[in-house]
Every structure is written in structure tokens, then in C-alpha cells.
Amino acid sequence: MAIKPLDESITSREAITSKADTAPRPTALIFDSGVGGLSVYQEIRQLLPDLHYIYAFDNVAFPYGEKSGEFIVERVLEIVTAVQQRHPLAIVVIACNTASTVSLPALRERFTFPVVGVVPAIKPAVRLTRNGVVGLLATRGTVHASYTQDLIERFATDCKIELLGSSELVELAETKLHGGVVPKEALKKILHPWLAMREPPDTIVLGCTHFPLLTEELAQVLPEGTRMVDSGAAIARRTAWLISSQENVISSDEENIAYCMALNADTDALLPVLQGYGFPSLEKLPI
């Protein structure tokens, strides 16, 4: 799934400022370590355009792929708690594969609202493969997570699963969203273990929410006809079902807002991008 522009009625600056969200709406928090979660947010908003959205990203501890599970759990709990103290949340989507693999139990134990996680789309990839070789492209944290191994054992016993962990690819996705160029040679170096195989994967699981941002660039490097699968659409459907199943949900008449953990030159440059996705303002979240 490549990042596609939303309808003009949603993304244009005029729409953001002139259609000040006046109808009360349930509040959904989308959280990621960086901007990759925008790929999941986009899928959710296409299904649920009338929610009140908060996008929070941890640009202080980014990237999460090399952090310990204990650190990630404590960090995510701290950030979600800080947002919840400022906004009545109806649902939280942890739009980060690495954080999802370790933090969901702790979040669900602490909070009463639904918490949705993102897991690698191994099951649908197994259905799509033609040569029986599926590649999982993720952060090293996700590749080595016990949850990922459980998914492979449950759904991929009849396939060969090739694992490739890369934090560099996360950085390249952030570079692209900030307006930078993604060098093809850098992608070739990252993907070399697969490109050098006699029979490389014909179906790739994009196991990090940053990676759909690079679908076009990856397609130029991977063998022709390689399919790329992510879990964004499935997460959107799950979110829609959970929202529709709730009763007496507290709603908000506030504008959409984005939170970061530190304001700097990078976040100044990112603000126009966030505005294009429907977040008129970006603030530092006190934690």
C-alpha cells in the first residue's frame, strides 16, 4: 500500500481551516515512534472520516527497532497516559509493529478503551505467494520478537519465511516524508540478502508501518512482480468495528492535533506534511 493523497476535501489547507470540526466525534489516538503510522492513519480515516484524530509520535526515542522491550513498554504507557489525561480517548491504535509486539498486554491492562496493535501480515502473504517463499521485512525488534515467531508457526508452516531486519529502512522512510530522496543503491544494499538468492521471495510482508511509504522505491529494486503486503486495511476494519461496538462514547468537538515529544527544526519542516494529512497543529506533549 503506497501512501496516497486523501481527497481534497480532507487534505487541503482550506478544508482544514474552514470546516472546523464542529460535530462531536469519538477520539482516536494513532501512535508511532515516527511518521510511519500515517500509513495506518490514512487507511483508518478513509473508513472513518468523521472521527477526532490525534497523531502522536516519539521523535525523542525514535527509532524503536533497537530499543529494549522494557523501555518500549514503559515509554508507550507514559505517552498514551499523557494523551489520555488531555483527551477522552475512545480507541488507541499502536501503529508501530515493534511497539505492538511488546506493549499491547500492558496497555490493555491499564486502560479500559480498546487498544489495537499492528502485527505483520504473514497470514495473507502466505495465501498470495506463488513460489512458496515469503519475505518479512521489518525492524530487528519485530523480526526477533516471539510474537512474530508464533505467527510464522501458526500460519506459515507450508512456506519458507525469509526474515530481514532493518532500522536503516525506517530512517529512509522518514527521509522521504521530510522531502528527501531515497537512493536506490541504499535500498539494494539493504535488500541484498534477498536479491542474491536463487529463488527470492515473491511476496513481501511490510512488517513496519514506515515501509508502505517506500512501496514505489522498493518496487524499483525488487524482482518484477514481487507483491508487497501490509496490515493497514485490516487494522482500519478492526478499528471501525470496535468504534461501532461501543456505547456511550465520549466525543470531542476539537480539531485534529498531532503531538511530538520535542519541537525542533525537523518538526518545523514536518508540520506542512502533517497539515496535508489533516492535522492543523503540532504540539509538544509534556511527559
Curated annotation (Swiss-Prot):
**Signal peptide location in the record?**
none
Recorded E.C. number(s)? 5.1.1.3
What keyword terms does UniProt attach to this protein?
Cell shape, Cell wall biogenesis/degradation, Isomerase, Peptidoglycan synthesis
Q: Which GO terms describe its molecular function?
A: glutamate racemase activity
Catalytic activity annotation: L-glutamate = D-glutamate
For whether the record's keyword set contains Cell wall biogenesis/degradation, the answer is: yes
Q: Specify the enzyme's EC class, one word.
A: isomerase
Q: Which domain of life is it from?
A: Bacteria
Q: Can you tell me which residues the record assigns to a coiled coil?
A: none
Keyword Isomerase among record annotations: yes
Q: Which residues are the active-site ones?
A: C96, C208
GO BP, one annotated term:
cell wall organization
Pathway of action = Cell wall biogenesis; peptidoglycan biosynthesis
Q: Which Pfam families match?
A: Asp_Glu_race (PF01177)
Q: Which residues bind substrate?
A: D32, S33, Y64, G65, N97, T98, T209, H210
Report the PROSITE patterns cross-referenced here.
ASP_GLU_RACEMASE_1 (PS00923), ASP_GLU_RACEMASE_2 (PS00924)
| Membership in a protein family | Belongs to the aspartate/glutamate racemases family.
Q: What does this gene product do?
A: Provides the (R)-glutamate required for cell wall biosynthesis.
Its name, as the record gives it, is Glutamate racemase
Q: What is the name of the gene encoding this protein?
A: murI
